[in-house]
Amino acid sequence: MSICAIWGAPQTGKTTLAVNLAYAVSRGDQSVCLISPVAYSELSAILGVKIPEENSLSAALRGAPLQRTVFKVDELFYVLAAPSAASAPDCDYSGEQVKTLLELARMTFDVVLVDCLSETNDLFSAWALNRADKVLLCAGGHVSGVLWHRANKKALQAAQDKTLYVGSEIIPGLDYAAMYELLKCTPEIKIPYIREAPLFQNERRFLFGLSGKKGRAYAGAINKLCEVITT
């Protein structure tokens, strides 16, 4: 029904956000398909699953039936990503193939999330940003993200009418307020820092649903994003 692109500078926690947001949407009794054109199947590593060629983004782009190519992670949670065994990114597809796949996914699932590459020259990510109803732009991360924002000023301006800034505060002690001032943005929703995040990911545990004060704060931020993309 709707397409949401998740974008931002490298190392801003885009994929972690995408995985946990998709999981949260599925917990709300809505079907969600998380699509990632990222090479070497980063998603399969985070989720702890092996994505075969026949259940991959490559197969879907070549015209294989979508219902047979998506990989089921959990009830109502599906993934369409690069195959785990891929040794190099598959770039042998056209813009029309991407548009067709995105529209088919829109008609098939309640929510489609696309974990976009930071690079603006990636064809799949470019079309996902173009066709998206909403763009979640991860701001924060590392200081180097300021340079990325400056280098991609035109692309950011093109999507500004449908962009919601998400504060990705992944480094403890960093003055993110000063960074947001440099970026001239005010994140509407901030994702709190969770020190144990790498450990939980290694254990194949979602950050959404963690107990404790930080877990509740994280869930609160994710739930707000769910409202944004599902209403």
Language-model features: locations:
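Walker A/P-loop phosphate-binding motif and the immediately C-terminal alpha-helix
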Residues: S2-A39
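Glycine-rich phosphate-binding loop used to anchor ATP phosphates in small-molecule kinases
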Residues: T108-E119
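Beta-strand-loop-alpha "switch" segments that mediate conformational coupling across diverse proteins
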Residues: E169-I171, A177-S211, I222
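P-loop/Walker-type NTP enzyme "switch/lid" segment
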Residues: C33-M107, L199-N202
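Conserved beta-strand segments of the P-loop GTPase G domain that flank and frequently precede/overlap
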Residues: I6-W7, I35, A81-A82, L113-D115, ...
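Short, well-ordered alpha-helix to beta-strand connector turns
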Residues: D29, D74, F109, A132-D133, ...
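Inter-motif core of Ras-like GTPase G domains
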Residues: D122-H142
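P-loop/Walker A phosphate-binding loop and immediately adjacent motor/lid segment at beta-alpha junctions
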Residues: D92-K99, R150-G173, G209-G212
